[in-house]
């Protein structure tokens, strides 16, 4: 596959995972066309998305020539291998590379599982359990940052790397959870490294154009809640016995 083949990215501004390939594309200075996909709950999925990702039918999807690559972490790895010139995203050392992949999967499996459990909690017991689990996950991630950064600014050391990009998907959801709950999960006493990392990461030139602010994410969530309420109201009215 030639590097000069057309590159497109199907993403969604509401999807926290879509930021991962956008940061990677920016770091690699790859020219591409960005195709905004409507929110899953607000509109029909495009035919291009359904054709490109027929299994999960979700963003993001990278289209390189006539090839479609799905899943955000998989896309980032593909970009690093298909465009091997500097800067490298994955570590060059085999052990460090395997470790970065392990912790990236930990973020998607454990951290997001805890975050989703908290937002979907139906009672105080479930909320307390999910709060404890998310706190534990972030404490482990803090420890991982301290070890992998080696006293430098990013998980990847001096520069943004694979694990930084993986962790980027957490920033929006955690900010929203903190905004709508009484809990503070990223705080100086327990996650000082992650706090400073988030500030540096958001300010990076490869991140800033694609990472919404906390206020923007919160406003978007409020808008989605309002739109969901309106849709449910219209649906209930149209199916009532008075129709």
Swiss-Prot record:
Reaction catalysed by this enzyme: RX + glutathione = an S-substituted glutathione + a halide anion + H(+)
Gene Ontology cellular-component annotations: cytoplasm; cytosol
Residue stretches making up the GST C-terminal domain: 93-220
GO molecular function, one term: glutathione transferase activity
Location (main, coarse): cytoplasm
Signal peptide range in chain numbering: none
Residues where Phosphothreonine is found: 159
Keyword Cytoplasm annotated: yes
Enzyme Commission number(s) of this protein: 2.5.1.18
BP GO terms, sorted: glutathione metabolic process; toxin catabolic process
Keywords: Cytoplasm, Detoxification, Phosphoprotein, Transferase
InterPro entries per record: Glutathione-S-Trfase_C-like, Glutathione-S-Trfase_C_sf, Glutathione_S-Trfase, Glutathione_S-Trfase_N, GST_C_Tau, Omega/Tau-like, Thioredoxin-like_sf
Cell location: Cytoplasm, Cytosol
Binding site for glutathione: 15-16, 44-45, 58-59, 71-72
Span of domain GST N-terminal: 5-87
UniProt function note: May be involved in the conjugation of reduced glutathione to a wide number of exogenous and endogenous hydrophobic electrophiles and have a detoxification role against certain herbicides.
Family designation: Belongs to the GST superfamily. Tau family.
Protein name, entry field: Glutathione S-transferase U14
Name of the gene: GSTU14
């Amino acid at each position: 596959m030639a590097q000069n083949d057309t590159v497109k990215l199907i993403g969604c501004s509401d999807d926290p995972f879509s930021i991962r390939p956008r940061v990677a594309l920016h770091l690699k200075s790859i020219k591409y066309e960005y195709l905004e996909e409507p929110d899953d709950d607000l509109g029909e999925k495009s035919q291009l998305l359904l054709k490109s990702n027929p299994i999960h039918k979700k963003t993001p999807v990278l289209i390189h020539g006539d090839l479609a690559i799905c899943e955000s972490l998989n896309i980032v790895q593909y970009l690093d291998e298909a465009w091997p010139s500097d800067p490298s995203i994955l570590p060059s050392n085999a052990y460090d590379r395997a470790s970065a992949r392990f912790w990236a999967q930990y973020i998607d499996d454990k951290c997001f599982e805890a975050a989703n459990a908290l937002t979907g909690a139906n009672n105080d017991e479930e909320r307390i359990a999910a709060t404890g689990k998310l706190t534990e996950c972030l404490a482990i991630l803090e420890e991982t940052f301290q070890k992998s950064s080696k006293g430098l600014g990013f998980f990847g050391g001096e520069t943004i790397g694979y694990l930084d990009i993986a962790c980027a998907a957490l920033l929006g959801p955690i900010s929203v959870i903190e905004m709508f709950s009484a809990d503070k999960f990223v705080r100086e006493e327990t996650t000082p490294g992650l706090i400073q990392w988030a500030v540096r990461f958001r300010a990076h030139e490869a991140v800033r154009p694609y990472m919404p602010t906390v206020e923007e994410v919160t406003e978007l969530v409020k808008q989605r809640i309002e739109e969901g309420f309106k849709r449910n109201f219209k649906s209930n009215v149209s199916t009532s016995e008075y129709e």
